[in-house]
């Protein structure tokens, strides 16, 4: 059934919809299946996403028609489809009237993903009007709070030197805590890897007790504050809260040095909101493991990593992994830096829409995946700043001299970039950085041709 006479209004102007402030706008790349017209399929998509179905129903009235989602722009050649969703469509809490991200997803990327006349459809951007934006929690904490704990400038404190304890599984509590202590002697921040929790060989309560002790010892030995991101991911809201409360109690006076990691993609919006609301004084670390199933450029359905990041800021993530923008081992490219800008800036341009965040606190980009001291300068050159949390697993513990030296090499790489000094030149007077060249020779040869001769001449 062609529903374009009801669910398509190509006379509507995007600027007018934004000025009106009553619609969430979504931009998709959509292709109909063979034999279906573009506008007809787009209208069916909008109907299925809002008030319609595949037939006219007798219960529809004038009010219902007033909250139809409307296709307002199409470009069949580029496969671009834009839809305006009235804000009245979205579900709100009965306890406080706040917005729910699950409702946003249910409408904009729900049943429409399984429609028989759609070959594929993927959301590439969305715009949230002020009246709806203000109903989301947004972050309560971000990197500025970490800088405060670390004793740095809270406006431009620079890279937080971090790691992920590897191997991601298989370490018992004491070896895990020992690895934490080793890294903390040179670095700032350690995160649980996403599957680490309460395995039978590494009970959470035992591991956390030992990690809290390792933090105290490292702080005493270095005179510097240290940070830990503990995984509280669980299916059950009560389990998440129980883990969080135990962790804070165990860290005691260092409770404000603790972030909570939640696997936000696999657990969904409910887990992120649980952590945000139950623990507003903790940095909420959004890990996105599994997201590539829908965000990868190879996947033509779902939504992009940019959209995932934007949703994370709405929900209240203090930080979210953003990949390495082509500078590490994970899928990505240099142009992905717009994702970081959308997380951190007061207003930012997306692929299709400019979003004003109206004072909503920034979300911190977390950089991980194949990074080491030699790759950092190029990454920072592309991004334009270094106000990120950077976590290197192999880049720290793959250092020939161990985790402490690996941490120091990462810090020295950042220092060199901040000073505008060539990395090989800086390495001549910084042993840990020099040894990073020997630790990662393939990267050294790729990014710094002739490094061996230059370092040997300095020696």
Curated annotation (Swiss-Prot):
Extra facts: The basic functional RuBisCO is composed of a large chain homodimer in a 'head-to-tail' conformation. In contrast to form I RuBisCO, the form II RuBisCO are composed solely of large subunits.
Residue list for modification N6-carboxylysine: 191
Enzyme kind, highest EC tier: lyase
Site positions (Transition state stabilizer): 329
Keywords in alphabetical order: Calvin cycle, Carbon dioxide fixation, Lyase, Magnesium, Metal-binding, Monooxygenase, Oxidoreductase, Photosynthesis
SUPFAM superfamilies reported in the protein's UniProt record: RuBisCo, C-terminal domain, RuBisCO, large subunit, small (N-terminal) domain
Organism: Cereibacter sphaeroides (strain ATCC 17029 / ATH 2.4.9)
Pfam families: RuBisCO_large (PF00016), RuBisCO_large_N (PF02788)
A molecular function (GO) term: ribulose-bisphosphate carboxylase activity
Residues that hold Mg(2+) according to the record: 191, 193-194
Catalyzed reactions: 2 (2R)-3-phosphoglycerate + 2 H(+) = D-ribulose 1,5-bisphosphate + CO2 + H2O; D-ribulose 1,5-bisphosphate + O2 = 2-phosphoglycolate + (2R)-3-phosphoglycerate + 2 H(+)
Function, in words: RuBisCO catalyzes two reactions: the carboxylation of D-ribulose 1,5-bisphosphate, the primary event in carbon dioxide fixation, as well as the oxidative fragmentation of the pentose substrate. Both reactions occur simultaneously and in competition at the same active site.
Protein name according to UniProt: Ribulose bisphosphate carboxylase
């Amino acid at each position: 059934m062609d529903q374009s006479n009801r669910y398509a209004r190509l006379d509507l102007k995007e600027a007018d919809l934004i000025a009106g402030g009553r619609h969430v706008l979504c931009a998709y790349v959509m292709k109909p299946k063979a034999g279906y017209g573009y506008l007809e399929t787009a209208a069916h998509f909008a109907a299925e996403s809002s008030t319609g179905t595949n037939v006219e129903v007798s219960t529809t009235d004038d009010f219902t028609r007033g909250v139809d989602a409307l296709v307002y722009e199409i470009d069949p050649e580029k496969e671009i489809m834009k839809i305006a969703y009235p804000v009245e469509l979205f579900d709100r809490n009965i306890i406080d009237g706040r917005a729910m991200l699950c409702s946003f997803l249910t409408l904009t990327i729900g049943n429409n993903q399984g429609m028989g006349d759609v070959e594929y459809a993927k959301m590439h951007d969305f715009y949230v009007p002020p009246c709806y934006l203000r109903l989301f929690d947004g972050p309560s904490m971000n990197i500025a709070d970490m800088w405060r704990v670390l004793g740095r400038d809270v406006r431009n404190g620079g890279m937080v030197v971090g790691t992920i304890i590897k191997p991601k599984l298989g370490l018992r509590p004491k070896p895990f805590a020992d690895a934490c202590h080793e890294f903390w002697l040179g670095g700032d921040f350690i995160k649980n890897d996403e599957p680490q929790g309460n395995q039978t060989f590494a009970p959470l309560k035992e591991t956390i007790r030992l990690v809290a002790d390792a933090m105290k010892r490292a702080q005493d030995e270095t005179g510097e504050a240290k940070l830990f991101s503990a995984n509280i991911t669980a299916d059950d809201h009560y389990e998440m809260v129980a883990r969080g409360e135990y962790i804070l109690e165990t860290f005691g006076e260092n409770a404000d040095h603790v972030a909570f990691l939640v696997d936000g993609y696999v657990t969904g919006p409910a887990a992120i909101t649980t952590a945000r609301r139950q623990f507003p004084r903790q940095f909420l670390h959004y890990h996105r493991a599994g997201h590539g199933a829908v965000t990868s450029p190879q996947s033509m359905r779902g939504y992009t990593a940019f959209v995932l990041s934007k949703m994370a800021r709405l929900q209240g993530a203090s930080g979210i992994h953003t990949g390495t923008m082509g500078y590490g081992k994970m899928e990505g490219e240099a142009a992905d830096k717009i994702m970081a800008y959308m997380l951190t800036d007061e207003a930012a341009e997306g692929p299709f829409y400019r979003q004003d965040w109206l004072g909503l606190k920034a979300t911190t980009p977390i950089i991980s995946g194949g990074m080491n001291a030699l790759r950092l300068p190029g990454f920072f050159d592309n991004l334009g700043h270094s106000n990120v949390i950077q976590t290197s697993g192999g880049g720290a513990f793959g250092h020939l001299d161990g985790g402490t030296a690996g941490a120091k090499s990462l810090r020295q790489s950042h220092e060199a970039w901040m000073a505008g000094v060539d990395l090989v030149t800086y390495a001549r007077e910084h042993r840990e950085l020099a040894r990073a060249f020997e630790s990662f020779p393939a990267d050294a040869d790729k990014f710094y041709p002739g490094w061996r001769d230059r370092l040997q001449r300095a020696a």
